[in-house]
């Protein structure tokens, strides 16, 4: 759906470029950057926002494939993209990298251990990158979205409802109540934070973990 919107956008082929690849496949990411290098010699920003919810269940009921798939998508993909983007951002004499974590990356998250572990890893890598890349004027920050209303949360609520054998409505209310503001987060909320962090207004902000979550106070 998103790519269709991009292709129909009046700026497509002028300022917008769309490309489909499996972010968890190193060869496909490499091919993506080959296409980027044909179009430009430098970039100013990278936003790593790919991620999956992972399985729902207690740890003794999960298997290694559950963990591997979650980490490959949520963490290793960030490595693939960041490694190839850094030289292009250096050529720009600085820029911004935004990595997406979650409230689960700063708190525990019952029944979602692979997801929580992967999101904590994103925070650790980002903090380290901020230290390594600061001398190149490259800022690295983390966004931790709250409960975003959309297709992904529909699947998460469905899976948790099935596992706990309770109604979807009950699970939905529980997710909303995790934030002190008792609200959903919307895609535009996240987009606005991204726009700020890649702008010159955030020129001195790096190494930060920023929640856009209505003040999430628990994950349970």
Model regions: which residues?
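Short-chain dehydrogenase/reductase
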Residues: 1-40, 65, 155-162
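C-terminal helical subdomain
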Residues: 142, 165-205, 212-214
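Substrate-binding pocket helix/loop in short-chain dehydrogenase/reductase
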Residues: 57-59, 63-71, 175
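Active-site helix of classical SDR
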Residues: 82, 118, 126
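Short, small/polar-rich loop/turn modules that mediate ligand/substrate recognition or access, typified
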Residues: 134, 139, 205-207
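Residue(s) in the substrate-gating loop at a strand-loop-helix junction
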Residues: 102
């Amino acid at each position: 759906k998103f790519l269709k919107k991009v292709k129909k956008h009046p700026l497509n082929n002028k300022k917008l470029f769309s490309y489909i690849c499996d972010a968890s496949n190193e060869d496909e990411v490499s091919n993506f950057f080959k296409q980027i290098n044909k179009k430009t010699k430098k970039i100013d920003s990278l936003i790593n926002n790919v991620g999956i919810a992972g399985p729902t269940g207690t740890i003794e009921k999960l298997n290694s494939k559950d963990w591997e798939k979650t980490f490959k998508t949520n963490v290793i993909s960030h490595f693939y993209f960041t490694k190839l983007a850094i030289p292009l951002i250096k050529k720009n004499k600085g820029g911004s990298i935004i990595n997406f974590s979650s409230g689960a990356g700063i708190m525990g998250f019952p029944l979602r251990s692979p997801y929580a572990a992967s999101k904590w890893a994103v925070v650790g890598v980002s903090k380290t990158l901020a230290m390594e890349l600061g001398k190149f004027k490259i800022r690295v920050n983390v966004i931790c979205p709250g409960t975003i209303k959309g297709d992904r949360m529909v699947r998460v609520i469905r899976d948790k409802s099935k596992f706990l054998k309770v109604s979807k409505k009950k699970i939905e209310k529980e997710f909303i109540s995790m934030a002190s503001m008792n609200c959903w987060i919307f895609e535009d909320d996240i987009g606005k934070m991204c726009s700020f962090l890649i702008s010159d207004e955030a020129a001195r902000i790096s190494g930060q973990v920023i929640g856009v979550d209505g003040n999430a106070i628990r994950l349970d």
